[in-house]
Amino acid sequence: MQQTSFEDQSNHTAWGLGLEADSVLEPTRDKGLQRLQAFMPNAGRAYQTHRNSDFGAGKHTHVSMLSPYLRHRMIDEAEVLETVLQHHSPNDAFKFIQEVFWRSYWKGWLEHRSLLWPEYQRQLPICLQQVQEGKHSNNSYQRAVAGQTDIPLFNDWCAELEQTGYLHNHARMWFASIWIFTLRLPWELGADYFVRHLIDGDPASNTLGWRWVAGLHTAGKTYLATPKNIRTCAELRLGASTDQQLGLNRLATSTFNLPERLSEQARQKTPIAWPTPAPGVPSCAPGKRGRRALLLTEEDLTWRPAQTPAGCVALSPSPRSVLAPSSTLVGEFVDAALSDALQRQQHGWNDTVPTVAPKALDETALIDWLVEQGMDEVICAYQPIGPARLRIEGLREPLAAKGISLQLQMRDYDRLVWPHASKGFFQLGKRIPEFLDVMSLAHGA
């Protein structure tokens, strides 16, 4: 079995984030753009040098703190790449640019295996029941999620996660490794705990990041958290505390092969049915008035169609987990982000101002609003694999029953990058210069 540790991982991070969250972040697009501009001077060589350092809660100064905005596309990948290349050459900003594409890789990889995430969700209750039925395993699980293990540093990460909605990238990897190989808990439950508490929690990067640490994404290649690599990246956070005081002396010294609980079918590639590029002028069925509404979800809060819609409405936040609600921090951030997106629809259109729903609505209220507004068609950004996608697809039939069609449109960036994410990151990563060229971003500062 091949084990990796920090020394082997200086060139990438398992979650493909590197652009991280913090509780001080305000869930508006304006604040995301301000943070993007503020971090740009540090997105070149300085980022490459210092991005691996975890200084502790409130001290994550060497990362951009953009991931919540990217997660919900309050800002999008293309404008982040364009901005960084206005300040740095592609070579100087390579590590920052690569992190953006790591996140895109995870999203695209899961798109090619559309059965994996739904099966993982179906297995979660079974996995939890099995843990709860074992006295030792249940005690270990309950202590882990309560931050009451005999590893004080692990407990500190739990506290930071629950209090801020954030963990540094390497802390996420160390946490996952300890959860799996030291506490011997199922990766599935660890991934679920993360996605409920991380403000930037994402079905693709979170689920697949945990599988990567467990040695299931790249078969047999596990990630081992060791006292040495933790101290290498978190020296200032740990201070003069000894390994014994931190519980680092209790860490597993080797990994082991985990059983693959997802079926072979779930792990196989599935046919892709991405929307065809949208026509320049919207079409409308005979007899219809052509009243089109833009539908927003938490997956993409900035996408707009070429033509001004007659109205705009947002779908209420989707539950991230089948086991428990998301944390209060996550819920408040997503609610406020949706409200900000609706408010922004009052501005920025070339001609008329659309009628905007006062708040995000559940399925029943959303359909009622569309009917009241006399809408014939709903247009929405393509939804990647995850809970929002299931809900949007579930709207097709009840919308059709009211004479309202549903059209999805895909971003050019996703259409460019995702087809190359079906295998390992290397196959996508080597095309980054090509992607930048296609996007007319190859010749930055």
Q: In which residue ranges do the predicted regions lie?
A:
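Active-site-proximal binding-pocket segments
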Residues: 75-78, 83, 91-279, 404
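Trp/Phe/Arg-rich N-terminal binding region typifying the photolyase-homology
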Residues: 1-98, 102-108, 112-126, 159-163, ...
